[in-house]
Design a protein with these regions (language model features):
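Non-ligating segments of multi-cofactor redox enzymes
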Residues: 1-234
Length: 234
């Protein structure tokens, strides 16, 4: 382990480095178990031609486009759906659903995939061995494998080649007490105001009030995973 100017570089394999930043959240501090962070997405508002959430997520986390759509990292992808009976079209953002009972955690052989006390599902890049069992287990195809060398590392979002990763619900923002994820912020500013982020356990939060008033559906609710991302209009 080499350290310089408050930044540590940990070699996990030849040519693969992960960065530890001195201003990172102390991993020994527990997440708040009284909260469960989640998202509500109104597909009636989501526009097929709008990619504000995707672009904001990529910028926030240093995700680059290498021109390989089948293997490039995607934390959010837009799905364009057509109802077979009515022909109605929907465009929905798909990301990690932050399940209460995440299959990715169950199959991980090293414990790299884990769920925090506040419901956010994460990957520890230091212990991920890139086996991709979690990718196969995820029914939402929400995880990506990092194939490329990374040149756009950001202080709050350390990433590693040869690791699997997915939406973190902007955990670096959550741990700083911020109220919006990059995608929800961008959707409100540049999009259709279709994404609400908040505490599902707080009955007074905007997301809870909206769910209580209009409801919301989990994708593949039949799996019993109790996802923290819910959708309206599907």
């Amino acid at each position: 382990l080499k350290e310089s100017a408050g930044i540590g570089f940990l070699t996990i394999a030849p040519g693969i480095f992960l960065q530890n930043f001195a201003n990172a959240r102390d991993p020994e501090l527990p997440a708040d178990s009284s909260k469960r962070w989640g998202m509500l997405i109104n597909t009636n508002l989501c526009d097929e031609g709008c990619n504000a959430c995707v672009d904001a997520c990529n910028d926030e986390h240093g995700i680059e486009d290498f021109g390989r759509p089948h293997s490039d990292v995607q934390w959010i992808r837009k799905l364009n759906l057509v109802d077979e009976l009515t022909g109605a079209k929907k465009s929905i953002p798909m990301m990690c659903q932050h399940c209460e009972h995440p299959p990715c955690v169950d199959v991980c052989p090293t414990g790299a995939s884990f769920i925090r006390a506040d419901g956010i599902v994460l990957v520890n890049s230091h212990t991920c061995i890139g086996c991709r069992y979690c990718m196969m287990a995820c029914p939402y195809k929400a995880r990506s494998f990092v194939h490329e060398n990374l040149s756009n590392q950001l202080p709050d979002v350390p990433r590693g080649k040869g690791c699997v990763e997915s939406c973190t619900m902007c955990v670096h923002r959550v741990d700083k007490g911020e109220k919006e994820t990059a995608c929800s912020e961008a959707c409100k500013k540049d999009g259709a105001k279709a994404i609400i982020f908040g505490d599902l356990n707080n009955p007074e939060s905007e997301i809870s009030r909206e769910l209580n008033k209009y409801g919301g559906k989990a994708i593949r609710a039949d799996l019993g995973l109790n996802t923290a991302v819910r959708y309206q209009g599907i």
